[in-house]
Amino acid sequence: QAIGKVREPEKLGNGVRLTISAPDLGLDQVGIGESIAVNGACMTVVEKGDDWFRIDVSAESLSKTAGLDTFGPVNLEKAMRLGDRVDGHLVSGHVDGIGQVVSLEQVAESYKLVILAPRKLAPCIAYKGSIAVNGVSLTINEVEDTSVGPRFSINLIPHTMEVTTLHFLKAQSLVNLEVDLIARYVQRNMELREGDDIL
């Protein structure tokens, strides 16, 4: 929905408190205690002003996500409400793993983003399937299984590059990944079936 900027990271116990400027997000519609996804990670608003808000990020969240404890631009999205239009796929804000950018290069008028994902996500990453990268809903174009995890590519149109932080990515950048919700439940169902003791 908008790009914000982390401007004041502060230590908070083993975690961190972040102040994020968000002049284009429409914070007048967000209350204290409501959720905003920051680079794909669902966070709770603890304070807010007209064009900024604060979140507390626990040590657990820091260990499971990338890029939430440093200065810089972040993708922001308010929680969807019943009746809102759905574009892309449903994203919950629960990060499933951290990926590493292999490359980002321009191909004709679009861009090809290649990411190496953790091995545990391999069953949920499929050709033409959906995945969220730093909170951006995208479609997987190619998948290659490697010994260290699935390597997949995504085609990015110029508009996506303009309105998200993905254009800041480069080789070795770390990104938050959230697999498709349906794929997650299918994987869980398969695991239970293999156990033969569901009921």
Enumerate the predicted regions with their spans.
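Conserved loop->alpha-helix
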Residues: 1-199
